[in-house]
Amino acid sequence: MCTEWQSWRSGRLSCELGHEAVGVVVDAAQSNRLKVGDRVIVMPHAGCGVCPACRSGEHIHCTSQRDLLDETGSSSGIGCYAEFLLKPDYLLQAVPDDIETHHAAMAMCALGPSFTAMHRMQVSAQDTVLISGCGAVGLGAIINARTIGARVIALELNPYRAALAQELGAELVIDPRAPDLIEQVRAVSGGYGVDAALDTSNNEGAPAVVLELLRARGRLAFVTWSGSLPVNRITGKGIDIFGAWHWNHDVFAEELLQRVRDARPLLDRLTTHRFAMSEVASAFALQETGNCGKVLLYPGKIAQA
C-alpha cells in the first residue's frame, strides 16, 4: 500500500486503488515473455510500449499512456486492489524463485524510486546522504543508501517513523522544525553539508531547506510533487538536481532484484503491518496516523512472512 489512503481520507473518487503489486499469471495470451504460473511484479501505469520513453524501458515516463478504462476499470491501468488485473506483459517483471513474494513487492514504491535517485546521484559508500521525509518511500531510501554502504541522516516529524528510520540504519534523525537544523546537519557532515540528499516529504517548504543542507557541488534528487527551489542558490552552490519516479525496466531489473535480496532483513523491518483486502478501511485508517512502515494488503487470507 502506498498513498491511496489520501483519496480515502478526502473522499475523492478513484478507480485506481493500488499501484504496486506482485501476482501470479493466470493467462498469458499473446505473450512470449511470460507463462501461466509465473510470479510477476506489476509495474504502475500503462505505458504505450512504442514511444521513445517506453522503448528505452522508462514506461513510467510514457508520453502517451494507454487508456485502459474499458479493459481494466482503471483509466491508468493500475487498480491492484483486486483479485485479477489485465496488464501488458512488458509491464510485468518476472520474480526469481529465490525471492519471496512479500520481498518482491518492495521492488516498487518501497525501493524503486529511491533506487533510481541513488543511481542518478551516483551515491557510494563514501557519501553522507540526507533523506527528507520518512514515509514508506523515504524509509525505503534509507534501506537503499545503507545497502550501498552510505551514511544516512534523516529528517522526520513523526516519532514512530523517526524511530523506525533509526532501526533501518539512519545514524541521526532530526526534526526538520529544529531551529538549528542546518547547524546539526553540518556538525555531523564535516562542517560543509551532506554529499547527496533525497526529498520524499511532499512538503511545499522542504526543497529549499534541503538545498541548504547540501555541501557545495552536492547532489539533490526528488521523489515528490510539491515545492519550489531558489535558482540563485542552485547556481551559487553548483548543485546537480535529479527527478526520480521509478526504475528503468530494461536496464535495472536484475540490479534492483539483487538489491531486494541484499536488503531482505531490512525489508522485514520496514514491513510493519499486514491486512486482508476485506480490512482495507482499517489499513487506510492506520496509514492516516503515520504510525506504520510499509503496509501489505492480501486478497483473501493474510499470507505469513
Model feature map: region roles:
Residues 1-5, 34, 43-93:
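Cysteine-cluster motifs in flexible loop/terminal segments that predominantly coordinate metals
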Residues 6-55, 96-99:
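Glycine-rich beta-strand-centered segment in the early N-terminal region that forms part
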Residues 20, 38-39, 53, 84, ...:
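Residue-level marker of beta-strand positions
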Residues 90, 97-178, 183:
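Mid-domain Rossmann-like dinucleotide-binding core that forms the NAD(H)/NADP(H) cofactor-binding site
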Residues 121-122, 163, 167-242, 281, ...:
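Glycine-rich cofactor phosphate-binding loops and adjacent beta1-alpha1 units
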Residues 208, 212, 253-305:
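C-terminal hydrophobic helical "lid"/dimerization subdomain
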Residues 219, 230-270:
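Rossmann-fold dehydrogenase core element
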